[in-house]
Amino acid sequence: MTLKTIEGTFIAPQGRYALVVGRFNSFVVESLVSGAVDALVRHGVSESDITIIRAPGAFEIPLVVQKVAQRSEFAAIVALGAVIRGGTPHFEYVAGECVKGLSQVSMEFGVPVAFGVLTVDSIEQAIERSGTKAGNKGAEAALSAIEMVSLLSQLEAK
């Protein structure tokens, strides 16, 4: 018995990609942006098909992503930012609302929204996840976006 499997590839289908980037903690976020752009280009996306849109911080990212999704001109959206835990509950509010909002936008508009917003306990963890020991989560999010565009195009063609 042969099971039929449908899965996305890492070869970017035609289309434009939006990176919605929170400016807060920019010393980490800019590495995520570089990683995402590099991954997209290496997998076949032209630089002219990548648009970077900057939001003030992670809390504002979901609204910007929603406005971008409403325009229907991007194959996928990659959300990038960094929320670093401090001594107050602020971290939980910002991180939780960001995740919830991005998920809602993806489901509402049927557009892949890749999550590349770091939610970490320390600056050291943020640095590790933006290009050192733990890889670059911006690049990983970009690859997820490519894979989802590929997968959804296959599902829509069936």
Curated annotation (Swiss-Prot):
This is 6,7-dimethyl-8-ribityllumazine synthase 1. GO terms for molecular function: 6,7-dimethyl-8-ribityllumazine synthase activity. One of its GO terms (cellular component) is riboflavin synthase complex. NCBIfam families: lumazine-synth, PRK00061.1-4. The gene is ribH1. Forms an icosahedral capsid composed of 60 subunits, arranged as a dodecamer of pentamers. Catalyzes the formation of 6,7-dimethyl-8-ribityllumazine by condensation of 5-amino-6-(D-ribitylamino)uracil with 3,4-dihydroxy-2-butanone 4-phosphate. This is the penultimate step in the biosynthesis of riboflavin. It is an enzyme of class 2 (transferase). Pfam families: DMRL_synthase. The active site is at H90. Pathway: Cofactor biosynthesis; riboflavin biosynthesis; riboflavin from 2-hydroxy-3-oxobutyl phosphate and 5-amino-6-(D-ribitylamino)uracil: step 1/2. Belongs to the DMRL synthase family. Keywords: Riboflavin biosynthesis, Transferase. The keyword Protein biosynthesis does not apply. InterPro entries: LS, LS/RS, LS/RS_sf. It catalyses: (2S)-2-hydroxy-3-oxobutyl phosphate + 5-amino-6-(D-ribitylamino)uracil = 6,7-dimethyl-8-(1-D-ribityl)lumazine + phosphate + 2 H2O + H(+). 5-amino-6-(D-ribitylamino)uracil binds at F24, A58, F59, E60, A82, V83, I84, F115. It comes from Pseudomonas syringae pv. tomato (strain ATCC BAA-871 / DC3000). (2S)-2-hydroxy-3-oxobutyl phosphate binds at G87, T88, R129. The keyword Transferase applies. One of its GO terms (biological process) is riboflavin biosynthetic process. Its EC number is 2.5.1.78.
